């Protein structure tokens, strides 16, 4: 199908308001495409961007989240809330086990976390806890890569065998803090009914706004390519099972070795196979021209010798591959 040429954006302006905040303007779009693409990109940015978050923690001396630690101003619940606010990024791996150990009076921050050269703490000044004189805080923090928001109660089902004292955290993986879009009017030459799309994106520093919208656009293109190609894996279609038919019924009536008279009478009634014959009743056969009681008795005796009778019912007769037009006249009377 041929279609008219659609306008594509020729002007893309990126205004960096801050390292974490950008306003991206794209124009022109055909009328209505601003809302169509803006809403799709916004939903992908908010729900499908990969990021990193603390998912599990073990604190020395803590058995459950409602415990309290001597020498620490915050209770465990507050410490866990502060851990969720840590923004970090792993390079070349998808999960890591980090350690945080500090003692003595002072403030514990995200910058005190140790995890190796491939762990980048985006907000090292983020406060985790405050220690008083003689206070001590030791913990291990598991960080994982993921998408969206995953409550700890959901992850708990898959961690039934976790160690005593291990606390699962609600994980917010999305590196995008806020996304909004607006559609304004655009003009190209004499056309004034076009759209200008303005997207306002703010991230937490794991990705910059430009990288985020590129990733979202890539996801959208990959998803829509399925519709463009109409390719995929079709659902398996279960083939209907053909009913089993006794091979004897598929044999021609000539195999019954009837007299020539009886055989010709049957063929005159389009009875070519044994399966055709056993479905006829005695009354029906006696109506056949030139077939009398003697021939009928002969047919009944031959069928009985094979464990068959007249008047039987076959639900799946005739089979689709049966040649009903087959006629064998080798025994026909001259």
From Swiss-Prot:
Q: Name one GO cellular component term.
A: DNA-directed RNA polymerase complex
Q: Where is this region: Alpha N-terminal domain (alpha-NTD)?
A: 1-231
Chain residue ranges for the region called Alpha C-terminal domain (alpha-CTD): 245-334
Which GO molecular function annotations are given, in alphabetical order?
A: DNA binding; DNA-directed RNA polymerase activity; protein dimerization activity
Pfam families noted in UniProt = RNA_pol_A_bac, RNA_pol_A_CTD, RNA_pol_L
Does this UniProt record's set of keywords contain Nucleotidyltransferase? yes
Q: What is its EC number?
A: 2.7.7.6
> What reaction(s) does this enzyme catalyze?
RNA(n) + a ribonucleoside 5'-triphosphate = RNA(n+1) + diphosphate
Q: Which GO terms describe its biological process?
A: DNA-templated transcription
Q: Which InterPro entries match?
A: DNA-dir_RNA_pol_insert, DNA-dir_RNA_pol_RpoA/D/Rpb3, DNA-dir_RpoA, RBP11-like, RNAP_asu_C, RNApol_insert_sf
Kindly state which keywords UniProt assigns to this record, in alphabetical order: DNA-directed RNA polymerase, Nucleotidyltransferase, Transcription, Transferase
Recorded hits in HAMAP family, A to Z, give: RNApol_bact_RpoA
Record's function text: DNA-dependent RNA polymerase catalyzes the transcription of DNA into RNA using the four ribonucleoside triphosphates as substrates.
What family does the database annotate?
A: Belongs to the RNA polymerase alpha chain family.
Q: How does it assemble?
A: Homodimer. The RNAP catalytic core consists of 2 alpha, 1 beta, 1 beta' and 1 omega subunit. When a sigma factor is associated with the core the holoenzyme is formed, which can initiate transcription.
Its domain description in UniProt is: The N-terminal domain is essential for RNAP assembly and basal transcription, whereas the C-terminal domain is involved in interaction with transcriptional regulators and with upstream promoter elements.
Database matches in NCBIfam families: PRK05182.1-2 (NF003513), PRK05182.2-5 (NF003519), rpoA (TIGR02027)
What's the protein name? DNA-directed RNA polymerase subunit alpha
Organism annotation: Nitrosospira multiformis (strain ATCC 25196 / NCIMB 11849 / C 71)
Lineage runs: Bacteria, Pseudomonadati, Pseudomonadota, Betaproteobacteria, Nitrosomonadales
